[in-house]
Amino acid sequence: MSGDDDWWTSSNEALLVSLVTPSDTGVKTLDTFHPEYTNNIFGEKEQIFGYKGLRINLQYNASDMLPNLKVSYKKKYQPTADEEALDINEVLSEFLPEIAFQKQSDFETRLKSIPDNWTPPGTLVTSFTNKDGEYEVYSGKITDPAVKQLLNRIQILVPFFVDGGTPIDMEDPDVDRWTIYFLYNKRPLLNQPDKFSYHFAGYSTLYRYYAFQPPAESESKTPTDTPTFSVDGDFDLDTLPCRTRISQFIIIPPFQQKGLGSRLYSIIYQQYLKHEPTIELTVEDPNEAFDDMRDLADLAFLSKQPEFQALKIDTSVEIPEEGKAPSNIVDQAAWEACRKKFKIVPRQFARVLEMYLMSQLPESVRPGLGAPEDEDYEEQSGRSKSKGHEKALPKPTPEDEHTYRLWMMLVKRRLYVHNRDALGQLELKERREELAKVFAGVEFDYARLLIKAEEQGKLAQADGETAGDQVPATPSAANGKRKLDEVEQAEGTAAASSKKAKVESGHA
């Protein structure tokens, strides 16, 4: 290819997504944003060859997300025998419906033909009021033509905002297993308070995996017995036990940083908590931002449930001098019953429970991000020293230390099981050091999330939002608590092993 850098353009910078509405002069732009990723579309380097002054404007009608692609440039590379400018329309035709390539005039005409009483496709699930207005959530199946049409228009957002994300195959024979949730901002029309416009804010896709449930054991069963399964011709597959997986989850940039992701996730979770065939709600390859949002939402919900609140550290458990960590630090039967009731996968439930139990530790031993007098307090916690938390750290009692050690062993036991293969490659001393290092990282992360939970709880009170709108306050993770570097030091954390065994924190 040509070595002239002037002919290369960043696809992330060149591509602009615009949300528009019809106006007397054509279209009015409401919001614009760039994609985070274009590597799945334009290649790993996210570069487009063959243009100078390139602009790719993907316009969307803000309501029904009717797309229109406009490509403009100042100069185009003249093709040679060896190379030519990239055909942008051809590349994007694999990600956009044919209607996206209509003339601008046809696009504007279509916008004006959309009725004032247009509503999103699917069934209205719920509505709620946020700080910036009213929102509605709709759900539907891809087998609904209107749902399929909207999804087909917006699927390019997946490679735009999910690294490595791929659109749903609309022709898959199992397409009926997908359920789509759309989030819309509902706004009253100017001078027409009884009429509303809808503005697309985000969506999520969920897929059902059928889950075989073995029959209960009986005394009469013999080793030669084989379970049988038969259905009549009218059997509804939707009634089979399943694991429902959140596959894609996108809030578009103009609606981010408003707490809408947490709201949508919580609404979806509540829907499947009531959905009898679903035995677990799982998440496919979440990124760090989604992990944080999910952790806080799960913590907010579970910490209000009596069954979850009843899960406590049994301080009567004795700590062995050597050997395995005790398995009865928390009642395992109650743990599993609670997890199944709330349909959360084992690893995620364990993490949220560990976080909650950490918030319940005696103040003298509860880890945090440091105290206000520490030099790095503001950097670590994101709080101003002037906002207080001047309370002195109480001296831990032997009982306090015992409780903390039990909690630490509970967490380390899970981390060891999760990383058994990697840790098994290390010598005993290195294994302990590596496990201590991972534990300290998990402990730090929990402290960070508990601070977020506390601050979101305070914001909910200040904004006057209804109960459940935000994460409730939890015991402070930075109110004069032991600094985590002290915990690391106490645990003998060392540098990473030269054997480079990959040991993970075990996030779901």
Curated annotation (Swiss-Prot):
Binding sites annotated in the UniProt record for acetyl-CoA: F249, I250, I251, Q256, Q257, K258, G259, L260, G261, S262
Primary location: cytoplasm
Keywords, alphabetical: Acyltransferase, Chromatin regulator, Cytoplasm, DNA damage, DNA repair, Nucleus, Transferase
Keyword Cytoplasm annotated: yes
Region of interest (Interaction with histone H4 N-terminus), ranges: 44-46, 207-209
Annotated region (Disordered), positions in chain: 364-399, 461-508
Keyword Coiled coil: no
Catalyses which reaction(s): L-lysyl-[protein] + acetyl-CoA = N(6)-acetyl-L-lysyl-[protein] + CoA + H(+)
Pfam families recorded: HAT1_C_fung, Hat1_N
The protein's Enzyme Commission number: 2.3.1.48
Active site per the UniProt annotation: E284 (proton donor/acceptor)
Protein's job: Catalytic component of the histone acetylase B (HAT-B) complex. Acetylates 'Lys-12' of histone H4 which is required for telomeric silencing. Has intrinsic substrate specificity that modifies lysine in recognition sequence GXGKXG. Involved in DNA double-strand break repair.
Full protein name: Histone acetyltransferase type B catalytic subunit
Organism per entry: Neurospora crassa (strain ATCC 24698 / 74-OR23-1A / CBS 708.71 / DSM 1257 / FGSC 987)
